[in-house]
C-alpha cells in the first residue's frame, strides 16, 4: 500500500488494526492517498487490509464513494462487511481516465470520508500529486486499488511506503 506523507507523520507504528484506523483518521486532517496493489487472484487480501479502516471512517457523517470498473456492490456484502449502507455510494463502469478525474473531484469536495477507485495502470507523478492535493483540500482519504497479475512486478515506486499483499501469506 502506498501512502503519501502518512508514513513520516508518526515515529511509532500502530500495532493493532484499531489503532491504525484511528491514526489514519486523525492524520486524514491533512488528507491521505494510498495505493493498494494486490494480486488479481487474491482480492480478499485487500479487503482484509481495508475493511477495518473503512468501518472506522463509516462512523463519520460523510459518504464513502466507490468508483468501480464493472462490479456492483451488493447490499448483502456491504452489510456483512460492517459498512454503513446508508453512507455508501457507488458509480460503476467508469473508464480509467474518468475514474481518476472523478476521484480528484470527489476528494476535493469534502463530502466523502473516503474515495476508492480502481485503476489498472500506475499513476504519473503529476496524477498522484493531483490526488494528494485534492485529498488535502477535502480532508479525505483516497484509495487507489490496482490489481496486478501474479507475474507482474511494479516498474517504479513513489517515495513512500508500498506494501504488496503477497507479503502477507
UniProtKB/Swiss-Prot annotation:
Induction: By DNA damage, as part of the SOS response. Pfam families: SulA. Disulfide bonds: none annotated. The record marks 169 as: Essential for degradation by Lon protease. Is rapidly cleaved and degraded by the Lon protease once DNA damage is repaired. It comes from the Bacteria. GO terms for biological process: division septum assembly; DNA repair; negative regulation of cell division; SOS response. Residues 106-112 are annotated as: FtsZ binding. Keywords: Cell cycle, Cell division, DNA damage, Septation, SOS response. Residues 162-169 are annotated as: Lon protease binding. Belongs to the SulA family. Component of the SOS system and an inhibitor of cell division. Accumulation of SulA causes rapid cessation of cell division and the appearance of long, non-septate filaments. In the presence of GTP, binds a polymerization-competent form of FtsZ in a 1:1 ratio, thus inhibiting FtsZ polymerization and therefore preventing it from participating in the assembly of the Z ring. This mechanism prevents the premature segregation of damaged DNA to daughter cells during cell division. Interacts with FtsZ. This is Cell division inhibitor SulA.
Amino acid at each position: 500500500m502506498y501512502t503519501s506523507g502518512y508514513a513520516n507523520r508518526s515515529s511509532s507504528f500502530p500495532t493493532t488494526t484499531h489503532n491504525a484506523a484511528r491514526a489514519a483518521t486523525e492524520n486524514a486532517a491533512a488528507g491521505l492517498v494510498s495505493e493498494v496493489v494486490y494480486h488479481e487472484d487474491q482480492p480478499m487480501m485487500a479487503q482484509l487490509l481495508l475493511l477495518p479502516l473503512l468501518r472506522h471512517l463509516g462512523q463519520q457523517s460523510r459518504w464513502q464513494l466507490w468508483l468501480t470498473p464493472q462490479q456492483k456492490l451488493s447490499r448483502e456484502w456491504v452489510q456483512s462487511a460492517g459498512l454503513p449502507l446508508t453512507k455508501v455510494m457507488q458509480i460503476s463502469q467508469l473508464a480509467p481516465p474518468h475514474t481518476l478525474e472523478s476521484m480528484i473531484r470527489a476528494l476535493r469536495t469534502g463530502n466523502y470520508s473516503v474515495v476508492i477507485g480502481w485503476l489498472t495502470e500506475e499513476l504519473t507523478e503529476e496524477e498522484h500529486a493531483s490526488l494528494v492535493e485534492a485529498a488535502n483540500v477535502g480532508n479525505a482519504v483516497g484509495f487507489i486499488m490496482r490489481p496486478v497479475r501474479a507475474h507482474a512486478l511494479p516498474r517504479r515506486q513513489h517515495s513512500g511506503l508500498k506494501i504488496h499483499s503477497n507479503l502477507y501469506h
